[in-house]
Curated annotation (Swiss-Prot):
This is Protein S100-A8. Homodimer. Preferentially exists as a heterodimer or heterotetramer with S100A9 known as calprotectin (S100A8/A9). S100A8 interacts with AGER, ATP2A2 and with the heterodimeric complex formed by TLR4 and LY96. Calprotectin (S100A8/9) interacts with CEACAM3 and tubulin filaments in a calcium-dependent manner. Heterotetrameric calprotectin (S100A8/A9) interacts with ANXA6 and associates with tubulin filaments in activated monocytes. S100A8 and calprotectin (S100A8/9) interact with NCF2/P67PHOX, RAC1 and RAC2. Calprotectin (S100A8/9) interacts with CYBA and CYBB. It is a peripheral membrane protein. The lineage of its organism: Eukaryota, Metazoa, Chordata, Craniata, Vertebrata. The modification S-nitrosocysteine is found at C42. S100A8 is a calcium- and zinc-binding protein which plays a prominent role in the regulation of inflammatory processes and immune response. It can induce neutrophil chemotaxis and adhesion. Predominantly found as calprotectin (S100A8/A9) which has a wide plethora of intra- and extracellular functions. The intracellular functions include: facilitating leukocyte arachidonic acid trafficking and metabolism, modulation of the tubulin-dependent cytoskeleton during migration of phagocytes and activation of the neutrophilic NADPH-oxidase. InterPro entries: EF-hand-dom_pair (IPR011992), EF_Hand_1_Ca_BS (IPR018247), EF_hand_dom (IPR002048), S100/CaBP7/8-like_CS (IPR001751), S100_Ca-bd_sub (IPR013787). Zn(2+) binds at H17, H27, H83. The modification N-acetylalanine is found at A2. Residues 13-48, 46-81 form the EF-hand domain. GO terms for biological process: apoptotic process; astrocyte development; autocrine signaling; autophagy; chronic inflammatory response; endothelial cell migration; innate immune response; leukocyte migration involved in inflammatory response. One of its GO terms (cellular component) is cytoplasm. It comes from the Eukaryota.
Length: 89
């Protein structure tokens, strides 16, 4: 039986594949699908951010796509922000 952390990691992978698979390449999240993903899946995180500049920051190899490793940087950023919010009173 999967642990809570294993379930959470599976969900992260599933979200990535749901959007990266739109264009048929499960290893690349393209600009328009990235925009759709962040505005749908983490709207509070991106409400005051430019998705284009965020895409460029994450695309460290400059191939105009976000691979899974680059996507995990976004997951970390959102996780850190959510953790901070969880401690606000």
């Amino acid at each position: 039986m999967a642990t809570e952390l294993e379930k959470a990691l599976s969900n992260v992978i599933e979200v990535y594949h749901n959007y990266s698979g739109i264009k048929g390449n499960h290893h690349a999240l393209y600009r328009d699908d990235f925009r759709k993903m962040v505005t749908t899946e983490c709207p509070q995180f991106v409400q005051n951010k430019n998705t284009e500049s965020l895409f460029k920051e994450l695309d460290v190899n400059s191939d105009n796509a976000i691979n899974f490793e680059e996507f995990l940087v976004l997951v970390i950023r959102v996780g850190v922000a959510a953790h901070k919010d969880s401690h606000k009173e």
